[in-house]
Amino acid sequence: LYPNGNIMLEHPVSKGYYCRLNLDRPVGLDDVQRIKQRMKEIIAEDIPFLRFEQHTTEVVELFRQKDMMDKVRLLETSGNLYSYYYTLGDSVDYYYGSLLPSTGYIHLFDLVKYYDGLLLQVPNKEQPNKLEEVIKQEKMLEVFKEHRRWNQILGIGTVGDFNASCNAGHATELINVSEALQEKRIAQIADEIYHRGQKGQPVKIVLISGPSSSGKTTFSKRLSVQLMASGL
């Protein structure tokens, strides 16, 4: 559909998966319908996913010929003697896990316009005949966008980029810049809390959520320091 475009499946958000379609123009509703229709056609064709395993140098060369340089950097820095890849018709790609036997196994999905990108809706885990209900998560999406901007500052777009940078001896620099970006963001949060108080809207409690061992306690201590620096 778009020979000069590419799609990036990015983050799980709003009970689905946020995707960026990189074109030379904004993504429109017509684009969404065209892609969804093509997806339905591929499912109806019941095309098999085929898995192949070869020497990593051969797989790297295959992706290099396809100009899939993100996969080239990933596999070149993986340290594995052998690597595998999947084919779907004429398409070749890498995936770290297992895939369905064929496209015909996909029975329920939807694709909708979602802000400046797309949202791939998937079935509910407990009720697989129903799609997950879309929950608007504007703040979560903004966090992911900020994460992408930070990666651009660091020059890290993929795991392969990260591995290559570490192999080149830039690990300490990556850590230092990442820490500086985090400290700057925490200071901005502290400033916002301070200014709300100045406007007569004092913040009485700050809630921090995240999974186990995600850095909540460390974040709270760093935020406390910044709040004290703001006079709170």
How should these model regions be labeled?
Residues 203:
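Short coil/loop residues immediately preceding or within conserved phosphate-binding loops
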Residues 229-232:
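Short beta-strand-centered segment that lines the nucleotide-binding/catalytic pocket of NTP-utilizing
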Residues 6-14, 18-199:
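Auxiliary tRNA-acceptor-end handling modules of aminoacyl-tRNA synthetases
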Residues 1:
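Active/ligand-binding-proximal structured segments within catalytic/core domains
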Residues 206-208:
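Hydrophobic anchor at the beta1->P-loop junction of P-loop NTPases
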Residues 219, 223:
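Hydrophobic positions on the alpha1 helix immediately C-terminal to the Walker A/P-loop
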Residues 213:
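Walker A (P-loop) phosphate-binding loop of P-loop NTPases
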